[in-house]
Amino acid sequence: MQIKLANPRGFCAGVDRAIEIVNRALEVFGPPIYVRHEVVHNKFVVEDLRNRGAIFVEELDQVPDDVIVIFSAHGVSQAVRQEAAGRGLKVFDATCPLVTKVHIEVAKYSRDGRECILIGHEGHPEVEGTMGQYDASNGGAIYLVEDEEDVANLQVRDPNHLAFVTQTTLSMDDTSRVIDALRARFPNIGGPRKDDICYATQNRQDAVKQLAGESDVVLVVGSPNSSNSNRLRELAERMGTPAYLIDGAEDMQRGWFDQTARIGITAGASAPEVLVRGVIEQLKAWGATGAEELDGREENITFSMPKELRVRSLI
C-alpha cells in the first residue's frame, strides 16, 4: 500500500490564529479562560486546550463575572457581543477575519434595508453568527437557503433590492449551483465580486479532488462537526472514491484497506498535522510504504493577533 498526501491540508490561518489566541490568553492571564463554543471544530485541539485550563461553554450565562472570554473562530451574533459588553466581560475575538468580512457585508445590507440571503447550513455556529449581524429594524430581512429547492421556495419582499452572502466552509460546487439558481430567479440580486468561500476551503477542496483521482480510498482527518472536513469527504465520494472521516488513527478499520494499493490522506482546516502523522504511522504498521506529498498550492497567509496577546520582543 502506498500513501499519498493532499497538499495543502490541515490548519488554515484562521484556525492557527484562533488556537494561538487561546494559548496566549492562558499564558498571559492564566487559567481559567472561558471560550464560547469550541474554538475550532476538532476534538483533539479542544481537549488539549481544556487540559491547559480553557473552559468551553455554549452561552454567556454559563460564564461568571470578571473573567476573560474568547469568541470562537466561527463568529458570534451582535446579540452575543452586546450581552458581553453589557456585563463588562473582557473579550478576545478569535473570529476568523474571513468570517468577519462576511459579517461586515451583512451589516451593510442591514443598514441599507436591503434583504439578504445567506447560503449555509442551518444550525452551524458560523451561520448563527452571520444571521445575527442583520438588524431587521431598518425594514429588511435575512433568509437562509441551503440548496436549489430552498431557492425555489423562497419568498422575498423586493426581488430588486436583494443580495446574497455565503458561509465560508461550503462545497464550492454546491454553492456555485445555488448561486446560479439565485441569479436565475432574482436577476437583479447583488453579491460579493467573488463568493465568500475562503481560500483555505477552496484549496483543500481542489487538493482532495486531485487526491481522490490518484487514490483507491481517501481518509479525511477531521471531527464529525467540522463543516469543511465533511465537504472534503463528500467531494472524494463524488469522485467515485470511497472516503472516511476520522478523528484520528484510532477510528480506522483494517478492513477498509483490503485490496487497496493507494491510500490518500487529507485533513480538514481544524485538524492538526500530528493527527495525520498518527494515521501514517498506523498505516505503516499495517504494511503501507512511503508517504508521497502531492503538488499543491502554497499558502502563506497569516492573520494578526489581538494587540494585548502579541509576544513582546526581548530587548
UniProtKB/Swiss-Prot annotation:
Cofactor note: Binds 1 [4Fe-4S] cluster per subunit.
Role: Catalyzes the conversion of 1-hydroxy-2-methyl-2-(E)-butenyl 4-diphosphate (HMBPP) into a mixture of isopentenyl diphosphate (IPP) and dimethylallyl diphosphate (DMAPP). Acts in the terminal step of the DOXP/MEP pathway for isoprenoid precursor biosynthesis.
Family: Belongs to the IspH family.
Coiled-coil residue spans: none
Record-listed [4Fe-4S] cluster binding positions: C12, C96, C198
Binding-site list for isopentenyl diphosphate: H41, H74, H124, S226, S227, N228, S270
Keywords: 4Fe-4S, Iron, Iron-sulfur, Isoprene biosynthesis, Metal-binding, Oxidoreductase
Catalytic reactions on record: isopentenyl diphosphate + 2 oxidized [2Fe-2S]-[ferredoxin] + H2O = (2E)-4-hydroxy-3-methylbut-2-enyl diphosphate + 2 reduced [2Fe-2S]-[ferredoxin] + 2 H(+); dimethylallyl diphosphate + 2 oxidized [2Fe-2S]-[ferredoxin] + H2O = (2E)-4-hydroxy-3-methylbut-2-enyl diphosphate + 2 reduced [2Fe-2S]-[ferredoxin] + 2 H(+)
Binding site for dimethylallyl diphosphate: H41, H74, H124, S226, S227, N228, S270
Catalytic residues (positions): E126
GO biological process: dimethylallyl diphosphate biosynthetic process; isopentenyl diphosphate biosynthetic process, methylerythritol 4-phosphate pathway; terpenoid biosynthetic process
Residues annotated to bind (2E)-4-hydroxy-3-methylbut-2-enyl diphosphate: H41, H74, H124, T168, S226, S227, N228, S270
Listed HAMAP family: IspH
Pfam families recorded: LYTB
Cofactor(s) named in the record: [4Fe-4S] cluster
NCBIfam families membership: ispH_lytB (TIGR00216), PRK01045.1-2 (NF002188), PRK01045.1-4 (NF002190)
Top EC class for this record: oxidoreductase
Protein name: 4-hydroxy-3-methylbut-2-enyl diphosphate reductase
InterPro entries per record: LytB/IspH (IPR003451)
EC number of this enzyme: 1.17.7.4
Keyword Oxidoreductase attached: yes
A GO term for molecular function: metal ion binding
Pathway(s): Isoprenoid biosynthesis; dimethylallyl diphosphate biosynthesis; dimethylallyl diphosphate from (2E)-4-hydroxy-3-methylbutenyl diphosphate: step 1/1; Isoprenoid biosynthesis; isopentenyl diphosphate biosynthesis via DXP pathway; isopentenyl diphosphate from 1-deoxy-D-xylulose 5-phosphate: step 6/6
